[in-house]
């Protein structure tokens, strides 16, 4: 092997993960319930960014567990609860959402993350909007 190839390989293995940019990012969630009069716009932080992954050419030869990709996910988080205004008494007017404190590149945990990217997802209000700053 040539010295250039070896140096490139060592550099890539050593500093490859530093190219990942995964950090808490400000995000607005729009929440509404059919029974409630208002839509609530909640400012929070989510984990967003890019994580280095490696795609194998021999997918048929590997176990499914070896094919999982790293995603930008929560390292530390807590749940905040907001009150949706204008709800009738028989409705539960609370909505809980995650707030990212720190993030990491790792396997997606379906216990607290949506691991599937949906192509069509709306994030807007259809009712009069109230702002919630927590």
Curated annotation (Swiss-Prot):
SUPFAM superfamilies: Cystine-knot cytokines. Glycans are attached at residue 43. GO terms for cellular component: cytoplasm; extracellular space. Keywords: Disulfide bond, Glycoprotein, Hormone, Secreted, Signal. The keyword Phosphoprotein does not apply. Disulfide bonds join 22-72, 36-87, 39-125, 47-103, 51-105, 108-115. GO terms for molecular function: hormone activity. Residues 1-16 form the signal peptide. GO terms for biological process: G protein-coupled receptor signaling pathway. InterPro entries: Cystine-knot_cytokine, Glyco_hormone_CN, Gonadotropin_bsu, Gonadotropin_bsu_CS. It is found in: Secreted. It comes from the Eukaryota. Its main location: secreted. SMART domains: GHB. Belongs to the glycoprotein hormones subunit beta family. PANTHER family: GLYCOPROTEIN HORMONE BETA CHAIN, THYROTROPIN SUBUNIT BETA. Indispensable for the control of thyroid structure and metabolism. Heterodimer of a common alpha chain and a unique beta chain which confers biological specificity to thyrotropin, lutropin, follitropin and gonadotropin. This is Thyrotropin subunit beta. It comes from Gallus gallus. The gene is TSHB.
């Amino acid at each position: 092997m040539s010295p250039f190839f070896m140096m490139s390989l060592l550099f890539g293995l050593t500093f490859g993960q530093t190219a990942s940019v995964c950090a808490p990012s400000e995000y607005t969630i729009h929440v509404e319930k059919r029974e409630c009069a208002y839509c609530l716009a909640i400012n929070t932080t989510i984990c967003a960014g890019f994580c280095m992954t490696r795609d194998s050419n021999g997918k048929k030869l590997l176990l499914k567990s070896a094919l999982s990709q790293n995603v930008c996910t929560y390292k530390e988080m807590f749940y905040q609860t907001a009150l949706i205004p204008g709800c009738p008494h028989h409705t539960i007017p609370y909505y809980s959402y995650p707030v990212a404190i720190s993030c990491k590149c790792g396997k997606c945990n379906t216990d607290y993350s949506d691991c599937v990217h949906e192509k069509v997802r709306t994030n807007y209000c259809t009712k009069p909007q109230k702002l919630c700053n927590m």
